[in-house]
Amino acid sequence: MISRRSTRQIQVGRVAVGGDSPVSVQSMTNTDTRDIEKTAEQLQRLQQAGCDIARVAVLDQDAARAISALVDMSSMPIIADIHFDYRLAIAAMENGAAAIRINPGNLGGEEKTAKVVAAAKMHGLPIRVGVNSGSIEKDLLKKYGYPTADNTQALIESALRNVRLLEKHGFEQIKISIKSSDVLTTVNGYQQLSKVTDYPLHLGVTEAGGLIAGTVKSSVALGILLNQGIGDTLRISLTRDPVEEVRVAFELLRCLGIRQRGPELISCPTCGRTRIDLFSLAEKVEQVVQAMEAPIKVAVMGCVVNGPGEAKEADIGIAGGEGLGIIFKKGVLYKKVAEEQLLEVFLAELRELEEEYQKKHNNV
């Protein structure tokens, strides 16, 4: 059982972050925020995938104003991502953003940052101090050098400097992120930061890459930190559809026993005994379980000889052979089905399990 680090708790809309609240999953839209229809559609898909909090880029006043319509169309808290222009932060808050993400060091000085803090206080909203290895102040780079796995001081000091600036103006509804594209720099940086602050931490590896590289890098870095009890909210950054970020995030949390959403799908890697198109079968089953909420374990195996035994912990599973497949529950044979009907019958069984869960869960 993982023991979470004790942190303060802040409220991002309806989602609590830090304290004893669950580790929340975030993503960021990749649409033009000013395109309300496309952005709202993406927010809806993110929420359906389980996303707790979404961030949108605010490039100008039109984007800030668009937040008002987006908030009306989505019950998910929306964070405004701000760079350089403090007026955009204020406008985003006025238009219903649940929080803002800034790097106070690039807002144009303390006077402008103070105006942002005053607006956040007035609206009762938190601020994320988000520092990336590529946005560190020049004097800190000169003093400490560029962040590496063995030297994360510039990242940490940049974050703490900006936190102190907010605190100076009486503001403490803060969460912090210090992101690098390097796994060990990210890990070591957050480990050191967690020792010197009790503000909630937003975990992430920036510019992680595509589906495979990004998933591996983020899972290694964030998995280490989460297993040490570090981290209150997270984003898996991928050069993909943002919905994939949410799916990877929940799979990571599931693997660590931190949080579960929907079914867990296990499948064998195939071998010479496989006599069916397991790749296609597993892909089609995965598409269905992604829309389910029942916290069950589903197995897709390629061999009727070893499949049920190897996946006996699964609540329900499927294994194929030559012309004949089987459906098993907890390793015990449940049905024999002709191969051409195997997928159809199995999906019907999955939908029945989901209906049972929904009836029980919703007290229907």
From Swiss-Prot:
Binding positions ([4Fe-4S] cluster): C268, C271, C303, E310
Catalytic activity: (2E)-4-hydroxy-3-methylbut-2-enyl diphosphate + oxidized [flavodoxin] + H2O + 2 H(+) = 2-C-methyl-D-erythritol 2,4-cyclic diphosphate + reduced [flavodoxin]
One of the protein's GO biological processes: terpenoid biosynthetic process
Cofactor(s) named in the record: [4Fe-4S] cluster
GO molecular function: 4 iron, 4 sulfur cluster binding; 4-hydroxy-3-methylbut-2-en-1-yl diphosphate synthase activity (ferredoxin); 4-hydroxy-3-methylbut-2-enyl-diphosphate synthase activity (flavodoxin); iron ion binding
Record's keyword terms, sorted: 4Fe-4S, Iron, Iron-sulfur, Isoprene biosynthesis, Metal-binding, Oxidoreductase
Record SUPFAM superfamilies: Dihydropteroate synthetase-like, Nitrite and sulphite reductase 4Fe-4S domain-like
Enzymatic class: oxidoreductase
InterPro entries linked: Dihydropteroate_synth-like_sf, IspG_bac, IspG_bac-typ, NO2/SO3_Rdtase_4Fe4S_sf
Comment on bound cofactor: Binds 1 [4Fe-4S] cluster.
One Pfam family linked to the record: GcpE
Metabolic or biological pathway: Isoprenoid biosynthesis; isopentenyl diphosphate biosynthesis via DXP pathway; isopentenyl diphosphate from 1-deoxy-D-xylulose 5-phosphate: step 5/6
Enzyme Commission number(s): 1.17.7.3
Role played: Converts 2C-methyl-D-erythritol 2,4-cyclodiphosphate (ME-2,4cPP) into 1-hydroxy-2-methyl-2-(E)-butenyl 4-diphosphate.
HAMAP family reported in the protein's UniProt record: IspG
Recorded family membership: Belongs to the IspG family.
PANTHER family: 4-HYDROXY-3-METHYLBUT-2-EN-1-YL DIPHOSPHATE SYNTHASE (PTHR30454), 4-HYDROXY-3-METHYLBUT-2-EN-1-YL DIPHOSPHATE SYNTHASE (FERREDOXIN), CHLOROPLASTIC (PTHR30454:SF0)
Protein name as it appears in the record: 4-hydroxy-3-methylbut-2-en-1-yl diphosphate synthase (flavodoxin)
Source organism of the structure: Desulfotalea psychrophila (strain LSv54 / DSM 12343)
Gene (UniProt): ispG
